[in-house]
């Protein structure tokens, strides 16, 4: 049993809305503390997560990785989830391959983690699941919150709770205007076009510049990358400006294949004798960097996952951020006699430990002329980090040599 197993105020119901990593892991961890949890899940009751075609997650087939911080959290607090993840195909690798202490990560496709989390959530006694349902409104009722829920096939209900955790993703919420203050929005002017491949047995391909990734910068602000996945799969990714004249042609599988095969040092990975394509072109626009905050006067609603903040997915931090937030929620809300004090603690911890990663993502993306003004405004981040180990950790992160899981989360205070 972990420290989360302590029970405090077990009769305080918490409603968690969402069907992604942040929602499922938060429900599991809060249940460990003895809280009564109601999960409003948009997926149907039959959804196991193992059929990617039934998922509403746009990037369900894209390569993902769980970085060291998220992996340490799973190992300690949700080992059964990690075990299931590895069983369905997640692959553990050491990013440094012997150069210094091991830095482990799990390569996976998103559906693998969803399947592992769903299987464990379905078995959690303290989690009541309202499947095939969506959160349609939240209203305040003194120190309580009322979550209004509607099923996809009709019918509705209202749940009164000590706290509502909104982990419903990035979509717009007309009901949340009175709760939400959008702190920052930094769009990313880049598109990503990816094709999933399977390596042929015995294929001889050139080594990548890093253990699981290789990247080549091309003219016209375009990049080509190979990203290794589980079970001898990889993705060939082209990132380009949304203003690049050839962008629309990358959605054509034949054009994407011919374009990538001409990339120096990486094209050989996609030759017919090396690999077989396993998907059409998977295209998506970067979500950019969004930081969304719940107004201070709201004491019964919090956000988690992409509903709270997003960073450019090219930096590969989203899954670990979601897992970290769920642990912060469980520690703050599960171990507080006064749940509203716990909410304040959670908000403080998120801003202290995760805000620096958001700022760093903005700085990494801050290369356009429009970004000059951002650099001046965010100069304080560099100044605060100047004498702090955070600067070194972020330098390592920039080079994809991910933080050792024994380090504490970064902070600028």
Where are these regions (language model features)?
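Short beta-strand to alpha-helix junction loop
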Residues: 65-66, 100-119, 173
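Predominantly flavin-linked oxidoreductase catalytic cores and closely associated redox partners
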Residues: 123-256
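Glycine-rich FAD pyrophosphate-binding loop
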Residues: 31-59
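C-terminal helical "tail/cap" subdomain of flavin- and related membrane-associated enzymes
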Residues: 330-413
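Beta1/beta-strand and adjacent pyrophosphate-binding region of the FAD-binding site
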Residues: 4-22, 38
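Conserved FAD-binding subdomain of flavin-dependent enzymes
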Residues: 29, 45, 60, 64-88
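A conserved beta-strand/loop capping segment in the N-terminal third of enzymes
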Residues: 72-110
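FAD/FMN-dependent oxidoreductases across multiple families
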Residues: 230-232, 244-349
């Amino acid at each position: 049993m972990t420290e989360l197993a302590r029970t405090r105020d077990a009769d305080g119901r918490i409603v968690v809305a969402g069907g992604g990593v942040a929602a499922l892991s938060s429900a599991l961890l809060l249940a460990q503390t003895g809280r009564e949890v109601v999960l409003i899940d948009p997926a149907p009751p039959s959804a196991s997560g193992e059929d990617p075609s039934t998922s509403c997650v746009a990037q369900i087939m894209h390569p993902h990785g769980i970085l060291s911080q998220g992996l340490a959290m799973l190992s300690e607090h949700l080992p059964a989830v990690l075990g299931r993840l590895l069983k369905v195909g997640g692959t553990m690798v050491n990013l440094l391959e012997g150069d210094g202490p091991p830095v482990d990560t799990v390569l996976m496709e998103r559906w693998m983690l969803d399947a592992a989390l769903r299987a464990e959530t379905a078995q959690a006694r303290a989690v009541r699941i309202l499947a095939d349902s969506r959160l349609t409104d939240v209203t305040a009722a003194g120190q309580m919150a009322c979550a209004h829920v509607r099923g996809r096939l009709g019918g509705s209900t209202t749940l009164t709770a000590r706290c509502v955790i909104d982990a419903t993703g990035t979509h717009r919420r007309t009901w949340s205007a009175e709760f939400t203050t959008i702190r920052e929005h930094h769009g990313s002017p880049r598109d990503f076009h990816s094709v999933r491949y399977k390596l042929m047995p015995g294929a001889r391909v050139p080594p990548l510049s890093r253990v699981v990734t290789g990247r080549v910068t091309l003219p016209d602000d375009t990049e080509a990358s190979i990203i290794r996945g589980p079970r001898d799969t990889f993705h060939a990714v082209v990132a380009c400006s949304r203003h690049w004249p050839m962008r629309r042609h990358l959605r054509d599988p034949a054009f994407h294949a011919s374009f990538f095969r001409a990339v120096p040092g990486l094209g050989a990975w996609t030759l017919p004798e090396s690999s077989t394509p396993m998907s059409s072109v998977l295209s998506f626009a970067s979500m950019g960097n969004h930081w969304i905050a719940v107004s201070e006067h709201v004491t019964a609603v919090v956000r988690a996952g992409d509903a709270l903040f997003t960073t450019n997915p090219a930096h590969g931090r989203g899954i670990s951020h979601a897992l970290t937030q769920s642990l912060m929620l469980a520690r703050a809300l599960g171990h507080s006699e006064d749940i509203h004090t716990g909410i304040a603690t959670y908000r403080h911890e998120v801003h202290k430990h995760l805000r620096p990663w958001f700022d760093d993502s903005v700085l990494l993306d801050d290369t356009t002329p429009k970004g000059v003004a951002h650099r001046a405004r965010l100069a304080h981040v560099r100044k605060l980090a100047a004498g702090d180990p955070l600067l070194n950790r972020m330098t390592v992160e920039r080079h994809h040599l991910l933080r050792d899981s024994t380090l504490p989360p970064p902070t600028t205070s």
